[in-house]
Structure formats: structure tokens, C-alpha cells
């Protein structure tokens, strides 16, 4: 069932998302360790049946940040009057099903280098998050190096046409399923498999009780993904039924 929601705030022109990204220099490789609360889940016990390519919606992420921006990635993504970011990469990870996946796999593959992390800051604004995604997820996949993993991510991001989500709102109202339909219209590869697109929401950070768009998951067959074969496959979890596209962008503190 299609659900209509109210868009209460004024829209920012789509041109604001088209500004050129200028990333600051990354001076040192981020040091990422496995959190104690996250166990190692070896590939042998958690085989990959589908890959999820996940993009986060910048306005919702930035609106949820509190206080001055300290993290370099947050400053790049959220610390400008009109950030050139809409949907940015969260990661590309393998899943066994909707509740299981491999993570923190042991690997001899080298991690991404400093220049490789720098290269991809305009699609994933945080070098630390890039390194985290490689160590937690990419190392469980078929890539021979962290650099190769991020090459695949960048190739897929460039291949996908990102619809202007702001245009989904009309006369102050929007249809939640329009996010899926907009991706299908922009990317014919999903025409026969809309279930390969999953919309994820988050509680509104403003206390309004609404739900905001958090992420869009695009799901693919595992076979050949490291070689640039991107074949849509149904996502292991259904989309959220309702969402609210927040049009405000966080201003510098």
C-alpha cells in the first residue's frame, strides 16, 4: 500500500547537490580495530548469498549530528552551507540472509593505501569509514586488496544513476515507494527486479515522531561482482513502509 507523508520543510534546489567536492588531504592511514562487541564471523560459516550496495542519505545523517563537527569526514560531508552530497556510499557487503553475514574475516589481502582512500573521499567522505568497511566487510569478499574493493565500489557508484530525491516531493506530499520507482526509472537493470531495492528509515532526529530516509540498499548477485558484474538480486529484507525525506542540510557550527 502506498503511504503519503507530509513534507513540512522547504526544498533545497537540486543544483546544490551538484557542487564540486573538494576533499581535504588525509595525512595518515586510519587505524581500525574490531570492536569487542562485534565477533568474527568467518566466511566458512556465513556464506555470501547476496551483496548489498548501501548508500546513505546525507541530509538525514547530518541532521542527526550534535554539537560542533570534529570528525574530518563529518566536516567534509556536513560542514558546508550547501554540501555537494546527497546519497553517499556506506559500503558494499555480503550477506547470508537478512540477519546473518560474514564480518571481520582474516585476510592476507593488503588494506587500501592512503592515496586510494583519498581518491574516494567524494563518494565516501570519511577515510576512517572506508578503512572500516574494508576490514569488516570487504576482506570477507573475493577482492585481492582493499584498493581493488574500493575500485569495485567506485565503479558501481559511477554506474548507478542517482535520482533527485528532492523532486519526489510535490505539493508538500510524497509517496514512500517513489524512492524505489525513481531508482527503477533511472536504472533499467532493476526494471524486472524491484525487490533488489530496499529503503531503510531512521527515527527523526528532531523529535517529531516522523521517520526519515536513512539508506538505500541495492542488492546484487555475488558471482563476478569483483570483476564488475552487477546483476540485481532480491534483497534479503523488505523496505520500510513509510519515510520522510528531510530537505534541510546541517550548517557549520
Task: For each feature predicted by the language model, list its residue ranges.
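Positively charged n-region of N-terminal signal peptides that target proteins for export
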Residues: 1-2
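Domain-level detector of nuclease and nuclease-like folds
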Residues: 69-253
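N-terminal module-boundary/linker segments of secreted carbohydrate-active enzymes
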Residues: 19-64
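Cleavable N-terminal signal peptides
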Residues: 5-6, 16
Amino acid at each position: 500500500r502506498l503511504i503519503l507523508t507530509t513534507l513540512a520543510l522547504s526544498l533545497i534546489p537540486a543544483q546544490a547537490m551538484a557542487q564540486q567536492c573538494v576533499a581535504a588531504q588525509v595525512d595518515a592511514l586510519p587505524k581500525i580495530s574490531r570492536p569487542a562487541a562485534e565477533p568474527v564471523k568467518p566466511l566458512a560459516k556465513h556464506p555470501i548469498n547476496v551483496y548489498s550496495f548501501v548508500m546513505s542519505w546525507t541530509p538525514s545523517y547530518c541532521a542527526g549530528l550534535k554539537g560542533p563537527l570534529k570528525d574530518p569526514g563529518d566536516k567534509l560531508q556536513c560542514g558546508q552551507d550547501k554540501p555537494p552530497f546527497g546519497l553517499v556510499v556506506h559500503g558494499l557487503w555480503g550477506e547470508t540472509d537478512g540477519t546473518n553475514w560474514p564480518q571481520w574475516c582474516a585476510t592476507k589481502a593488503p588494506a587500501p593505501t592512503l592515496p586510494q582512500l583519498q581518491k574516494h573521499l567524494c563518494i565516501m567522505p570519511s577515510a576512517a569509514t572506508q578503512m572500516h568497511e574494508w576490514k569488516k566487510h570487504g576482506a570477507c569478499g573475493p577482492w585481492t586488496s582493499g584498493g581493488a574493493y574500493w575500485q569495485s565500489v567506485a565503479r558501481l557508484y559511477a554506474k548507478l544513476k542517482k535520482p533527485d530525491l528532492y523532486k519526489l516531493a510535490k505539493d508538500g506530499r510524497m509517496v514512500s515507494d517513489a524512492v524505489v520507482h525513481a531508482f527503477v526509472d533511472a536504472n533499467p537493470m532493476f526494471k524486472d527486479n524491484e525487490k533488489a531495492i530496499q529503503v531503510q528509515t531512521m527515527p527523526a532526529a528532531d523529535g517529531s515522531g516522523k521517520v526519515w530516509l536513512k539508506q538505500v540498499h541495492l542488492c546484487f548477485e555475488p558471482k563476478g561482482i569483483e570483476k564488475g558484474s552487477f546483476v540485481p538480486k532480491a534483497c534479503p529484507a523488505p523496505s520500510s513502509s513509510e519515510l520522510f525525506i528531510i530537505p534541510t542540510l546541517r550548517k557549520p557550527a
